[in-house]
Amino acid sequence: MLELKPRFEEYIKKIIPEPEFPKFLEYCEKPTRRIIRCNTLKISPEKLKARLEKKGWEISQVKGFPEAMVIENKLLPGELGKSIEHQTGLYYVQELSSMMSPLALQATKEDYVLDLCAAPGSKTTQMAMMMENSGLLIANDVKIDRLR
């Protein structure tokens, strides 16, 4: 059971009216979808999808964003992060919501980008991919221990 802190619950109840609030709590209880982002600098989304499906993974692509793929079937613990495809940088494990900022920015090869909240790096690597490893992309974070 998800436990919301009382202050947070009060705040959310002001935003989400009472008839809808139980639905919000129900949604919070659902497991998050396992989503990966294809690194198009190394492989096309079609080739990655085919490669992962050969391993028995059930993949669906996110409408309007072919680089984003949902892993539909249950995998072994750690399988998503330990696969050879992940280890060689063919995909990055990344929430769909995290992919939205770089998509909104639409950085190109000619741009200079300063990412001041870069750790752990999912949005930064996505921007590098979108910029085709060109332009200038500086990654920094206020918390030095988050940078690796």
Give residue spans per PLM region.
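S-adenosylmethionine
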Residues: 1-148
